[in-house]
Amino acid sequence: MSKSHLLKYLLISPNLPVGGFCYSEGLESYLNTKDLKDSNSVKELIISELKIGQIRLDARLLLDFFDIFNELNEDKNFKNNLQKLLSLDKWILSSKDSVEMRAQQIQMANSLFDLNKEFGFEYLYKKNKKNSWPLAWSWSCYCFEITKLEMVETFLYAWSANQLSAALRIIPIGSTKAQLIQRDLLEIISKVSREIMDKEIDDIYFGNVGLAMAQQNHNELYTKLFRN
């Protein structure tokens, strides 16, 4: 088995700087409105986001970035591909509904680019001043020679694990319950990942505005909870 199969765990390990990020992404607002009260409601929220949330668009964009990296590496249509890369990166970052979410994306991307550099995979191309998390994730997977399906799966797994880590602190749901939820999410993560692999960006539907609205009310709360 290729070591690239194991390198993906560097990206999702909660003990490393990348996986160690713990952002609540609006969960406190749900908690305050009593929409988030136990492990079942947490599980339902995460499943809803995986099925119709914006995280699907982020995951789909990983594939476009990955393909562009291949083209750039082979020096095919270099100027056009680089411009497309920069435009997509700026677009997905600007699509975030709150200043806090954009700041989260930028911080996580910068940290992952720094980690990649330490691994010997410094980013080779021109970047925007502010970069998106999907761009950094795709670059890591490209450098680690992780398959595109595994790239999407680990991205969604890491996102869901992050939400559960936040829920552990703010509800709390208990670590055993969180593990059970993560286990139950594996099937939906696998299904959604394969669906995304078969779709173009324009075919990705997302319509869950609840979390987006909640995110705009959570900046002070998550700062208190997760600054350390």
UniProtKB/Swiss-Prot annotation:
Protein name: Urease accessory protein UreF
Coarse class of the protein's main subcellular location: cytoplasm
Family assignment from sequence similarity: Belongs to the UreF family.
Location within or outside the cell: Cytoplasm
Gene Ontology terms for molecular function: nickel cation binding
Gene this chain is encoded by: ureF
Pfam families xrefs: UreF
Keywords: Chaperone, Cytoplasm, Nickel insertion
Function: Required for maturation of urease via the functional incorporation of the urease nickel metallocenter.
Record Gene3D superfamilies: Urease accessory protein UreF
Gene Ontology cellular-component terms listed: cytoplasm
Quaternary structure and interacting proteins, as annotated: UreD, UreF and UreG form a complex that acts as a GTP-hydrolysis-dependent molecular chaperone, activating the urease apoprotein by helping to assemble the nickel containing metallocenter of UreC. The UreE protein probably delivers the nickel.
Disulfide bond annotation, renumbered to this chain: none
